[in-house]
A protein has these predicted regions:
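Flexible glycine/proline-rich
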Residues: 2-169
Length: 169
């Protein structure tokens, strides 16, 4: 991607999805090198944005692709289309099981959220959270979001949950 354009970022502190990249490339794929060694697109500066495409480099594992698409790519595409892309709504739910988490990165664990007759929400994982376990995404109705500095979660602790649109039930 560096040869075709500019890398905005590469690798993020999240799991799954760490090897995600975002950048801009010249629409015609051509770059010019200035005498000082700085790259620029072959288009004039006034046409620069129109002649550049945004490139999302997604991870290789299917679950990591789905998580990064849901968390980053979908909102970006909606904004680019002129739609109002609001930040995903985070609900709070009580964890039905202990969750292991090391501080230092944000984790998105696939979860099954249940709304009880009294209105309270609980969540449990779909089981194995490996980024290649596609069935974990198929079973989930949301993502348990464990923040960057957060550690382990005990049964009954409140956690943030990002729902897949309207899937509580």
């Amino acid at each position: 991607m560096k040869k075709l354009g500019d890398v905005a970022f590469w690798r993020i502190a999240m799991r799954p999805g760490r090897p995600m990249a975002v950048g801009r490339i010249a629409a015609d794929g051509l770059q010019e090198e200035s005498a000082a060694g700085a790259r620029r697109t072959s288009a004039s500066s006034s046409q620069n944005d129109r002649n550049r495409a945004i490139l999302f480099g997604l991870p290789g594992n299917p679950v990591a692709v789905m998580v990064t698409f849901f968390a980053f790519v979908r909102p970006a595409l909606l904004r680019m289309m002129g739609a109002r892309a609001e930040a995903p709504v985070l609900l709070r739910a009580a964890s039905e099981e202990p969750l292991r988490k090391k501080p230092g990165r944000t984790e998105y664990q696939r979860g099954i959220v249940t709304q009880h007759p009294d209105g309270r929400l609980t969540v449990r994982t779909t089981g194995n959270q490996g980024s290649g376990v596609l069935s974990s995404m198929a079973q989930a109705n949301g993502l348990i979001v464990l923040g960057h500095g957060q550690g382990d979660v005990a049964v009954g602790d409140q956690v943030s949950v990002m729902m897949f649109e309207g899937a509580v039930g």
